[in-house]
């Protein structure tokens, strides 16, 4: 099998006015995280170069906030063009919240190849997690990304207090969008957040990956946030469960494993690391 590696850059951090209960970037909670409006373009380009050197085929430009406005659109398109100029063969992913088709077309024109917008949780559970924007807005943005000609990456977060039935519901809703990639995140507790300070059981996490794979047999399944927390050194079990992609390096506001250590683990297992999104 081949494993796909992706890196992310939090190009705008901790300045979100929404109230998603799982997210330390919300200004409504007092999580101890870095907060800044924008990174410099130079910093973003250097991070992309490091990601490519660490065998990442994807590099995600993430902004904090509900969705795209004119300032965010201008900044992300600038960043995308700068990265593509210096690292032309890396696949760029935009993750910039809710968006209209015309905005997403602007991102595509600037060099964004894929758009990540997670459903986060099941429609029936969503109102218990977020009140400042609707689940329907999130779903529509996913449809908009496809209409704009972008590859869709959409998944969610497990372990927020949802029931088993709601997990099944969310997986069905994700599958209905026929995404290219499905990021699976596991909730990372933080004392500043109004959710239980509990972590999903590893066996449950593996079952989720298996169930998701049954629904999207041809999609990339990427285990992202919470991988190290939930699985520790046993994380390669996700590959047997059906995952074929991971995020390397740090996440938005939590630390990840060193990329070289993950690569070493994969090489010891004899796993081939993909060199293109389309292999």
From Swiss-Prot:
Any Pfam family the entry gives: Radical_SAM
Binding site for [2Fe-2S] cluster: 60, 95, 153
Oligomeric and partner information: Homodimer.
GO molecular function, one term: 2 iron, 2 sulfur cluster binding
Cofactor note: Binds 1 [4Fe-4S] cluster. The cluster is coordinated with 3 cysteines and an exchangeable S-adenosyl-L-methionine. Binds 1 [2Fe-2S] cluster. The cluster is coordinated with 3 cysteines and 1 arginine.
Enzyme class: transferase
Domain Radical SAM core: 1-227
Pathway: Cofactor biosynthesis; biotin biosynthesis; biotin from 7,8-diaminononanoate: step 2/2
Catalytic function, reaction form: (4R,5S)-dethiobiotin + (sulfur carrier)-SH + 2 reduced [2Fe-2S]-[ferredoxin] + 2 S-adenosyl-L-methionine = (sulfur carrier)-H + biotin + 2 5'-deoxyadenosine + 2 L-methionine + 2 oxidized [2Fe-2S]-[ferredoxin]
Protein name (Swiss-Prot/TrEMBL): Biotin synthase
GO BP annotation list: biotin biosynthetic process
CDD domains reported in the protein's UniProt record: Radical_SAM
Cofactor(s) required, per the database record: [4Fe-4S] cluster; [2Fe-2S] cluster
Function summary: Catalyzes the conversion of dethiobiotin (DTB) to biotin by the insertion of a sulfur atom into dethiobiotin via a radical-based mechanism.
SUPFAM superfamilies given in the database record: Radical SAM enzymes (SSF102114)
Annotated Gene3D superfamilies: Aldolase class I (3.20.20.70)
Keywords for the protein's UniProt record, in alphabetical order: 2Fe-2S, 4Fe-4S, Biotin biosynthesis, Iron, Iron-sulfur, Metal-binding, S-adenosyl-L-methionine, Transferase
EC number(s) per entry: 2.8.1.6
Binding site for [4Fe-4S] cluster: 16, 20, 23
Repressor found in the keyword field: no
InterPro entries assigned to the protein according to its UniProt record, in alphabetical order: Aldolase_TIM, BATS_dom, Biotin_synth/BioAB, Biotin_synthase, Elp3/MiaA/NifB-like_rSAM, rSAM
């Amino acid at each position: 099998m081949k494993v796909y590696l992706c890196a992310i850059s939090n190009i705008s951090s901790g300045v979100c006015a929404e109230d998603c209960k799982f997210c330390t970037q919300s200004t409504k909670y007092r999580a101890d995280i870095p907060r800044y409006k924008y990174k410099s373009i130079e910093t973003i380009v250097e991070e992309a170069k490091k990601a490519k050197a660490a065998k990442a085929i994807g590099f995600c430009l993430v902004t904090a906030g509900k969705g795209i406005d004119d300032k965010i659109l201008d900044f992300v398109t600038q960043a995308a063009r700068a990265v593509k100029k210096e690292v032309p063969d890396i696949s760029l992913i935009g993750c910039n919240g809710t968006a209209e088709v015309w905005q997403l077309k602007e991102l595509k024109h600037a060099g964004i190849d894929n758009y990540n917008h997670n459903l986060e949780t099941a429609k029936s559970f969503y109102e218990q997690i977020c009140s400042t924007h609707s689940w329907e807005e999130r779903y529509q943005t996913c449809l908009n990304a496809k209409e704009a000609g972008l590859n869709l990456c959409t998944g969610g977060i497990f372990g927020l207090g949802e029931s088993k039935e709601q997990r099944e519901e969310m997986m069905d809703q994700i599958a209905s969008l026929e995404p290219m990639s499905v990021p699976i995140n596991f909730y990372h507790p933080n004392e500043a957040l109004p959710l239980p300070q509990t972590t999903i059981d590893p066996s449950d996490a593996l079952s989720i990956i298996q169930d998701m794979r049954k629904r999207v047999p041809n999609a990339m399944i990427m285990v992202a946030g919470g991988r190290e927390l939930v699985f520790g050194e046993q994380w390669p079990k996700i590959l047997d469960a059906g995952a074929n992609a991971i995020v390397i390096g740090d996440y938005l506001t939590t630390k990840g494993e060193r990329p070289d250590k993950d690569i070493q683990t994969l090489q010891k297992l004899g796993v081939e690391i993909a060199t293109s999104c389309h292999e």
